[in-house]
A protein has these predicted regions:
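Catalytic cores of enzyme domains
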Residues: 47, 84-246
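Non-catalytic, usually N-terminal nucleic-acid engagement modules in DNA/RNA processing proteins
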Residues: 1-91
Length: 246
């Protein structure tokens, strides 16, 4: 079995150990070159504060991107409730800290083979004062070919956009050229749909802009009511026709 297949199997097995098939589906994994020019372009698209892989791990050769898709039950709930979703909040609260377990298993596997590796924390990689994040898991996943961005700023994979992304950097050479993915977002494709704009409870998301501060304020409000302590909303994902793909 190739190193890439071993890493993919390791990630799948670790997530399966959660034993929560009611919340999570089988992860999907892909790889990108740490020196892909699109990482440098993120300094223009996102901002100069966004770090390149080699600024996080100097000898990085590859970025491992993976997505843990939520189940249909989890994805469907946020659009049906006021405030935060119980199922979405639980899935979020469980998987975010568990990414540390998955990442450490991957790092240990690579270390045993003589490669350096490090992970970027799954969430809250931004300064709450300015909402500037030093790393975008979704953008890394897009570069790795896992999906394309929709109008709601979420990455739509072959399993949809409802779920969570994470990244591991390594000195191992794992990447291969990925064919450009075709967008699944109906609004991006032909201007139809737009349900994500209509459902946003605070109008943070509109066709030509997204206000991160207003969105985060709504998530913080929901956090006060969430028994899992999750600062989430998920409505713009839940309402999307391609949020869940079987």
């Amino acid at each position: 079995m190739s190193m890439k297949n071993q890493i993919e199997q390791l990630i799948v097995e670790k997530v399966a150990l959660l034993n929560r098939p009611d919340l999570f589906r089988k992860p999907i994994v892909s790889f990108s070159s740490a020196t892909d020019s699109r990482y440098s372009e993120l300094k223009e698209i996102i901002g100069p504060w966004h770090l390149n892989p080699t600024e996080l791990l100097p000898d990085a050769q590859s970025v491992i991107s993976y997505f843990v898709p939520f189940t249909s039950l989890v994805v469907a709930e946020p659009k049906t409730v006021d405030g935060g979703s119980e199922a979405w909040g639980e899935a979020y609260a469980i998987i975010n800290p568990y990414f540390n377990v998955v990442n450490q298993a991957v790092i240990q596997y690579l270390s045993d083979l003589g490669y350096s590796a490090s992970a970027v924390q799954a969430t809250h990689t931004y300064d709450p004062k300015d909402m500037k994040s030093m790393w975008s898991h979704r953008s890394a996943a897009a570069i790795a070919g896992l999906g394309t961005f929709g109008a709601n700023r979420m990455l739509i994979t072959e399993k949809g956009s409802g779920g969570r992304f994470c990244s591991v950097l390594t000195s191992a050479t794992l990447y291969e050229e990925q064919a450009p993915a075709e967008t699944r977002c109906l609004y991006v494709k032909n201007g139809s749909c737009g349900l994500c704009f209509k459902i946003c409870p605070v109008n943070a998301l509109v066709p030509d802009s997204f206000d991160k501060f207003i969105c985060q304020d709504e998530c913080n409000k929901n956090q006060k009511q969430d028994r899992h302590g999750a600062d989430t909303c998920g409505k713009c994902i839940s309402v999307c026709p391609v949020a869940y793909i079987d």
